[in-house]
């Protein structure tokens, strides 16, 4: 079982609309503004918004992360609170990203009941 950790990587402690930057910067141990700027640059390169899944998916791929879709078992997908497929991962749930590491998920709100559509792990 994973435990919720109330954590906000946003340097101004703002809430909302930046889960992509928060999850990625926390997972990569990069500062929020660096990740935000790099996503914006890639968004401009791809002519798309930086928080679009195609943009952040490409960003993670270029940074050495691998996408793993979560297949439903018996019609159900794993929940954030019981995700156990990787020790450290960025999880994609409905309209949201969250970082999980060592049985803790880091976010500004408890998204533990959300179903996991897929996740990224760092290629070693």
Regions inferred by a protein language model and the residue ranges of each:
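Short intrinsically disordered terminal tails
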Residues: 1, 123-124
């Amino acid at each position: 079982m994973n435990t919720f950790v109330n954590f906000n990587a946003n340097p101004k402690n703002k809430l909302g609309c930046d889960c992509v930057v928060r999850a990625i910067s926390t997972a990569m141990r990069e500062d929020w503004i660096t990740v935000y700027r790099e996503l914006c640059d890639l968004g401009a390169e791809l002519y798309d918004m930086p928080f679009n899944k195609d943009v952040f998916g490409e960003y993670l791929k270029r940074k050495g992360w691998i996408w793993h879709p979560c297949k439903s078992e018996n019609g159900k997908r794993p929940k954030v609170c019981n995700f156990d497929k990787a020790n450290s991962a960025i999880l994609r749930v409905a309209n949201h990203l969250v970082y999980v590491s060592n049985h803790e998920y880091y976010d500004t709100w408890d998204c533990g009941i959300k179903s996991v559509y897929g996740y990224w792990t760092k290629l070693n």
